[in-house]
Amino acid sequence: MAIGVIHVTQNGNRNKMTLKTPASWHRDMWREGLPAGNGKIGALVYGNIADETIVINHCKLWHWGKRNELPDIHEALSETRKQLDKGNFWDANTISADLLKKKGYTARLASPCPLCDIKVIMDSKNAFHHYRRVLNMETGEVCVSWKEEDCEFTRKLFVSRADDMLVYKLTSNQRHLNANLFLQLHETYDKDTKKMREEQGSNLVEYADKNFIYYSARNEDGRDFGAVMKIVGDGDLATQDGRSISVKNGNEITVYCCFFVGGQRNTEFEKYKRKLEGWNDTYEACLKRHAKLHGALFHNVDIQIADQDLDKSNEELLFNAYEQTASNALIERMWRFGRYLMISGTAENGLPFPLYGLWPGKYRLPWSHNMANENIQMIYWHTMVGGLEYTMKTVLDYYWSLMDDFRQNARRLFGCSGIYIPAGTTPGMGYPNQIVPVILNWIGAAGWLCQHFYDYYKFTGDEEFLKEKILPFMYEAAQFYSDYIVMDEKGNCKIYPSVSPENTPKSLMPGDEYEHMAHPCPSAVNATMDFAIVKELFRNIIEASKITGMYQDKIKSWETILKAIPEYQKNADGDIKEWMHPDLTDRYTHRHLSHIYPVFPGKEYVIGRDDMDMPVGFELAVSKRTPDSQSGWSLAHMACIYARLEKPEKAIRCLDILTRSCVLKNLFTLHNDWRKMGLTLDGGESVPVQMDANMGIANAVQEMLLFVSDDFIKILPACPERFKKGAVKNLHFMTGLISFKWDILAGYFVCNIASLRNTRLTIQLPKFFHRYAMNGHSIDGRTPGIALKAGERLCITAQTDKEEEETNLA
């Protein structure tokens, strides 16, 4: 359902990003490739003229994991607590991890496995000029083009949602198309490529037959993965060396490629050969079908804050950001790119979007799993307000598939009922696998994920799914916390061991010289984040139980726990404490911002709705985080926090620093600045691509423009000074859609609200305008309450002096 009154300019340049250079990170070209995908299959285009590589990944292809039986070590919890009660934090820290290792537990997370490379070797007889790489985000098409003297070459591809295949077209305007195409095991400069080849041995198959190329390898489970490629064109086609197809003197060739994961290669080869033999649709016809599906998702929401520099290349925009500040054009492009990645990188009935999306370029990358102590949450923050609610169902289905593992975790690690979710998981692996205290002793994952799942219900109103999966999941999480929490001598809840991800209290650090040590002693008592998560979960599950009539016998016990949760504490400087314990002091040289949870990503304290004293303490706590301890994702997180605190210039400054330090020319975000310029932590030789920051930026932009909660929304709550005008189309609140357009210098504001379900809420209108009218009638103040039935609409405008006079006369 679209709101028709607010129109946004459909300038094609807004949805295209242009690069003037190919991927060029030495020995790691994949980092700067351009991504295409249909939510299940990903293609990453390097853009090299003479020796092109397109890396193919499939969401269900993982390898090199290890699963073994989880031993029962629940007795370790009581011993850990004994040591914590004595103040022996260091002794308590490793008890559980050491016992697991002693009992021989050696689980290991799997990693995404690149499926293959599509290789294109081309003659290059003359020096190139006018080189471009272009990603069209509204269609999902990647195009590489260049000229050699007066001859023009283009190579373009997309991964079809409609037909579940990659379609690739190569053209030359002078019949100078000479190319050799083949499929191969993905090549890297890592020793892992050699390991893969040795593991495959005779299982690796690559051959060409007529105009078809076949490729297959075998995974650890004994099942095959591979590809079948068909090539058609007007040049001279011939097989070469038994594994490739050459094209001579062509104007145009089209490549159709299907991929499989699982099954048996000969069966899959025959299946896809039959499919492609009868395939006669042109590239353009296939693109039209795909673009219709892709575009419907991409365009269901829009944000425009830029009116210049829209045609500048990524390199130009990033260079300008490096000089001082990110332009509106770059911020808007980053927002669009975050949405594009999400739409292209995950799908219904697929798997959650991992940290590398569908575009990993190595066989064993750091943090390539689904990490739930920050990262997967950040990846999905933007989806509800951004109109991509469907993606959350995939996340819940993924975690639901691991429930048996999670129940065993709770019993065998802690002697508790319900579920314990380890921070890191991969498909089919829900047991703990990072056997270190900072991960093993953190209990917040299940509760934090419940926030996302319950938001899915609130934004969709899907009560059937609430009853079927969301509320049962919340119930199991609540059962665990009910068992895990103890009462102290004052009758307050006590949570221990309790980890504030991945931080260690300053008072437990071994010395100032170890200030940047990763996490020496994180197992503490009463982390603020744990209380915030438990409080939010129990409030939500009580509400959901009353809506559905389920779990009525548990409500009283949940209410008892809620009443016993202590108030958040402040330290001597007035900032919120990260650990609510007298012996644990705050450590500011850290990237995680977990104790700010009640402000963001939670909504326990909202500026303009709640006690103003508490948010000041949260702001102080954020402001003391040191710049040289941050990462790409933490800067995005910090921007979201400052937006919630209505500090727009601080929020946009975080994005300025992020784009200056942790963004590659293809707009992939990094964990840390590889150039060591003092804007982030020093990651040493490790500079991982992490797309959580891509999504975090998308969310930060949305948070600046719109705050949404159950019964209170704010328009332009943290609009930075540089966003003087702009337009928003169809952002989502929980029961409807909102579109608005503003021009601060012109005194112009118009907002349209469409109620999809019965709506009752308060709106905080922008502070930049002072006289408002609803449906043409003047209103007092800027926080009106509204009540709309499903299907009703409301128009709010800012009035000039003349308009107000005319309204009053009427």
Language model features by range: what are they?
Residues A347-Y356, M392-K393, T460-K467, E476, ...:
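Short, well-structured active-site flanking segments
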